[in-house]
Amino acid sequence: MSIASKVYQALAASKPLCRLLHKDRRGCGIYHGRSPDAGSYPILVYSVISDVPALSADGCEMERRVTVRLHILTKDGAYERIEDAARKVMDSLGFRRYQSMELAEKHAFVKIMDFKTGTGVEE
């Protein structure tokens, strides 16, 4: 199973997180890459932004470092509870928060968080 699939399954399975997000016909507002309908908030968008070798031996990649980025989009900037719930999910997957930033767009407030983990190649 890919890292993106594992992240989606864990985020979507989190009832505390899903209760805080907009519901649509597909379920709670969790999307990979981008949101198909940016008019309904709050939503969470995730993507794998980096997957690089971290350890190699005898020309074989033994471990890699993966970075997943979460965007929390809200109309009112109240994303603290969503952030806490998402961090708990990412921590349970072995990811650790690397950096975060806040943006104000024309129609939404955005909280961006990057999470990193190391993983064996065979996983």
Cite the ranges covered by each PLM segment.
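Small/polar-rich, solvent-exposed N-terminal microdomains that initiate assembly or binding
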Residues: 1-51, 55-56
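Short, low-complexity, polar/charged sequence segments that are solvent-exposed and flexible
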Residues: 49-52, 63-67, 88-92, 118
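Residue-level signal for secondary-structure boundary sites
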Residues: 52-54, 78, 121-123
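Oligomerization/assembly interface segments of phage tail-like spikes and tubes
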Residues: 62-76, 109-119
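Charged low-complexity stretches with an acidic bias
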Residues: 74-84
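Acidic-leaning, charged glycine-interspersed low-complexity segments
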Residues: 83-123
